[in-house]
Amino acid sequence: MPRIKQTEKSYFCYMTENRRLQAEKIISVIILVLLSAIYIACICARAKAAASPKPDFTVVIDAGHGGIDGGVSGIKSGVKESELNLDISRKLKTVFEKSGAKAVLTRKTEAGLYGIFSKGFKKRDMKKRMEIAERASPDVFVSIHLNYYSSSSRRGAQVFYKIGSEKSEKLAISVQNQLNALQNKNYAPLPGDFYVLNESSGEAILCECGFLSNEEDEAMLLTDEYRQKIAETIFVGIETYRYGLATGVN
């Protein structure tokens, strides 16, 4: 077996060591690139989070009725309360979202929340609404409805609040004040024994936005412009309460 000369052996060792060092450099570069990529990704994620802060206020908007339960009907047009409730609720949601708040609808379409229509559908519908509301952990819960009364002369909006809740009463006062100003009325908010209010964990109100038994209220509520005003007025009332600017009933 031929013997490897010392110079050849040294050269071989040199080449082996050189390759090892080159491999280590390549691995170091790869690790550096990966760490840099991770660092940049973290910076981008933080920047994105800072640019899109989590909303610090959540409102759940409950459009009353829906599906087989259309609510009351317009005295002249026959329009279903559920349709107008949903439109006002959608408008209110849009206004809140434009302000940077999070707004959640319990009902997004004309369908009810009771599943298959059968005995006990109303109770299932109400329970589903509250499940949606509780998952959202809202600061405020507001249910949108329209009223009906035996006397067709009665008109204007009426706000109800969760019984035994001082904060809900103050919220109702603030919203009622704004609606009174819009409709030139002087109503005071009332305690309301309603399932959606009783089952709410926080501040909760129910807004009867007008009387479909009154032709003037009905005619206004049939216009998109007035429904937008109603939504904006409720928004202002809630925001006034939120920032501690509400006073007594005007």
Regions found by a protein language model. Give the residues of each.
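Short glycine-rich His-centered loop
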Residues: 57-78
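Extracytoplasmic glycan-interaction modules
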Residues: 2-4, 84, 101
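Alpha-helical structural elements
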Residues: 6-9, 34, 189
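Active-site-proximal helix/loop segments of hydrolytic enzymes
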Residues: 16-30, 37-54, 79, 86-250
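N-terminal Lys/Arg-rich, disordered targeting/topogenic segments
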Residues: 1-24
